[in-house]
């Protein structure tokens, strides 16, 4: 599993010109599910993301998590995180999980984040989306379960 974590001042996602998710300060997550991912991978990444200390404390050191800050999360499914570009010029997405499995694990990931105490907004799985964010920093971290 791969989660591209972006610290954001705000973020939103639209489907068919309708806003389906909107957050203030927090994290924008692009979430990719691998074909061999399991519930353990999902739980690991949710725990890591929720407790990742990438927000500044009162001493201006990256020492606080999104939970510490009371921030929220915008979670977007993103199978293209498993695009392999080693051969040719068109990415190969064979390592990405099939949609049925990916949707189930993506929903479990978001549920785990909520269980940890986060407010989670999402895009629409499998839809063409317009994602907007204002990066904060910028701070961008790749969390992987493998």
From Swiss-Prot:
Q: Which UniProt keywords apply?
A: Cytoplasm, Hydrolase, RNA-binding, tRNA-binding
User: What is an annotated GO biological process for this record, any one?
Assistant: D-amino acid catabolic process
| Short sequence motif named Gly-cisPro motif, important for rejection of L-amino acids, residue ranges | 137-138
Q: Which Gene3D superfamilies match?
A: D-tyrosyl-tRNA(Tyr) deacylase (3.50.80.10)
Give the EC number(s) under which this enzyme is classified: 3.1.1.96
Domain of life where this protein originates: Bacteria
| Compartment annotation | Cytoplasm
Q: What is its main location?
A: cytoplasm
Q: Which reaction does it catalyse?
A: glycyl-tRNA(Ala) + H2O = tRNA(Ala) + glycine + H(+); a D-aminoacyl-tRNA + H2O = a tRNA + a D-alpha-amino acid + H(+)
Instruction: Tell me if RNA-binding is a UniProt keyword of this record.
Output: yes
Q: Does the keyword RNA-binding apply?
A: yes
Q: Which GO terms describe its cellular component?
A: cytoplasm
A single Gene Ontology molecular function, please?
D-tyrosyl-tRNA(Tyr) deacylase activity
Catalytic class of the enzyme: hydrolase
What does the UniProt record say this protein does?
An aminoacyl-tRNA editing enzyme that deacylates mischarged D-aminoacyl-tRNAs. Also deacylates mischarged glycyl-tRNA(Ala), protecting cells against glycine mischarging by AlaRS. Acts via tRNA-based rather than protein-based catalysis; rejects L-amino acids rather than detecting D-amino acids in the active site. By recycling D-aminoacyl-tRNA to D-amino acids and free tRNA molecules, this enzyme counteracts the toxicity associated with the formation of D-aminoacyl-tRNA entities in vivo and helps enforce protein L-homochirality.
Show the domain comment. A Gly-cisPro motif from one monomer fits into the active site of the other monomer to allow specific chiral rejection of L-amino acids.
State whether it acts alone or in a complex, and with which partners, per the record. Answer: Homodimer.
Q: Could you tell me which HAMAP family the record lists for this protein? A: Deacylase_Dtd
- What's the family? Belongs to the DTD family.
**The name this protein goes by in its record:** D-aminoacyl-tRNA deacylase
Underlying gene: dtd
């Amino acid at each position: 599993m791969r989660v591209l974590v972006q610290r954001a001042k705000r973020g939103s996602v639209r489907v068919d010109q309708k806003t389906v998710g909107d957050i203030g300060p927090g994290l924008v997550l692009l979430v990719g599910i691998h074909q061999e991912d399991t519930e353990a991978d999902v739980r690991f990444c949710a725990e890591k993301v929720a407790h990742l200390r990438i927000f500044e404390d009162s001493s201006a050191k990256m020492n606080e998590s999104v939970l510490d800050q009371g921030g929220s999360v915008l979670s977007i499914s993103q199978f293209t995180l498993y695009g392999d570009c080693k051969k040719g010029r068109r990415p190969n997405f064979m390592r990405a999980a099939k949609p049925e499995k990916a949707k189930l694990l993506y929903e479990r990931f978001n549920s785990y984040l909520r269980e940890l105490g986060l407010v989670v907004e999402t895009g629409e799985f499998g839809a063409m989306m317009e994602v907007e964010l204002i990066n904060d920093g910028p701070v961008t971290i790749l969390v992987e379960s493998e």
